[in-house]
Amino acid sequence: DYVQKTHHIFLQLSSEKGVNEGVDFKDEAFAHLRWTTMWWGFAGTDFFIQSQYDDFKDLKIRQLEGGYLRLVSPLFDGEVALGLGAMSEYEQLKEGGGEGFTTRFTNYVSLTEKWFGGKLKMSLTGYYQPKVEDHSDYRMTAVGQVGVNIIGGFSILPSFKYSYDSKPPKGVVVDDLQLKLYMRYHW
């Protein structure tokens, strides 16, 4: 995270590989870069690029580039944000196929809140991404986490991610739930 006045740059990188008795059970990676600028106080823009793969979802590569109009309103000790935008998507599957390039609308609503002087933080975001040329082909994702400050800069963050794809690739389930527990040290 890099924040300066009206600009916020966010980079997230993750890679997960799991092997049990010589057999892979997880192999995925994710990279996301976003630039948010609040031009008019409550209104601004988000621009992003993203790349990912997931061996166990037959996803060789998925690349996104897009942008949003972002509207933000304070809420207690947090905020609620709404994003309305569009993105290009390139998707290639391991077994061939995939849709190649397509365009999707991408919309989100996000809620963040803090309690106990910031020792407990919650974030919840929902995304809805219908294909521009076929609204019956859509993806929905809900992501949430609670950050609990334990001591100093050390926190634990239980989190979840639920994804739904109305028209997934052949052999891939329509929905997926991930539950994780992160530990973070902030200095």
What residue ranges belong to the model's regions?
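Outer-membrane beta-barrel "beta-signal"
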Residues: 175-187
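Repeated loop/turn-to-beta-strand initiation elements of outer-membrane beta-barrel proteins
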Residues: 3-11, 41-47, 76-80, 114-122, ...
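Gram-negative (and chloroplast) outer-membrane scaffold detector with strong preference
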Residues: 37, 41-55, 59-89
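Solvent-exposed loop/turn segments connecting transmembrane beta-strands
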Residues: 3, 19-26, 53-61, 94-99, ...
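Transmembrane beta-strands of outer-membrane beta-barrel pores
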Residues: 4, 15-19, 49-55, 71, ...
